């Protein structure tokens, strides 16, 4: 399980160093093999250990290619999916097209989200957090049943 937000730097080749606290579990779970793709709703990337990505692929394979909305999701997620292998120094090369899509420059936020990471441009991440907090504080909508049962 991945949690927490960590600022990491992209080097001139587009590689990021995976924080040490995640390296061992990633090597055990996926031998350092990862898959990166776009997020359909946010200006960030999604980074999955290969076994977790294979579960997503199975779910995507059950969608109908004849349904335009389902085909669109398949096209976007699978079409942007890029495999990356953690090297001996614990670095991952993020494809240039993906970096461009998410507006990633030097400073990047690696955000743990249970079974995957999100990759955000640092400034975009902080703005998103601010926007999310503002939205929660100003919302007039009742909490969903699931959120009502969540005790923090």
UniProtKB/Swiss-Prot annotation:
Subcellular location field: Cytoplasm, Nucleoid
InterPro entries registered for this protein in UniProt: MraZ (IPR003444), MraZ_C (IPR035644), MraZ_dom (IPR020603), MraZ_N (IPR035642), MraZ_sf (IPR038619), SpoVT-AbrB_dom (IPR007159), SpoVT-AbrB_sf (IPR037914)
Major place of residence: cytoplasm
GO molecular function, one term: DNA-binding transcription factor activity
GO cellular component: cytoplasm; nucleoid
Domain SpoVT-AbrB as annotated: residue spans: 5-52, 81-124
One annotated GO biological process: negative regulation of DNA-templated transcription initiation
Xref: Pfam families: MraZ
Keyword Cytoplasm assigned: yes
Keywords: Cytoplasm, DNA-binding, Repeat, Repressor, Transcription, Transcription regulation
Family, similarity comment: Belongs to the MraZ family.
Physiological role: Negatively regulates its own expression and that of the subsequent genes in the proximal part of the division and cell wall (dcw) gene cluster. Acts by binding directly to DNA. May also regulate the expression of genes outside the dcw cluster.
Quaternary assembly: Forms oligomers.
Protein name according to UniProt: Transcriptional regulator MraZ
């Amino acid at each position: 399980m991945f949690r927490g937000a960590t600022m990491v730097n992209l080097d001139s080749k587009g590689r990021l160093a995976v924080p040490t606290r995640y390296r061992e579990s990633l090597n055990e779970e996926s031998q350092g093999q990862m898959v990166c793709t776009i997020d359909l709703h946010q200006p960030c990337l999604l980074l999955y250990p290969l076994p977790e990505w294979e579960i997503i692929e199975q779910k995507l394979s059950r969608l109908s290619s004849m349904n335009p909305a389902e085909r669109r999701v398949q096209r976007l997620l699978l079409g942007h999916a890029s495999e990356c292998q953690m090297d001996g120094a614990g670095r991952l090369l993020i494809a240039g097209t993906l970096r461009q899509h998410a507006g990633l420059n030097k400073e990047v936020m690696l955000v743990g989200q249970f079974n995957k990471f999100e990759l955000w441009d640092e400034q975009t991440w902080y703005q998103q957090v601010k926007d999310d907090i503002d939205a929660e504080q100003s919302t007039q909508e009742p909490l969903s049943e699931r959120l009502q049962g969540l005790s923090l």
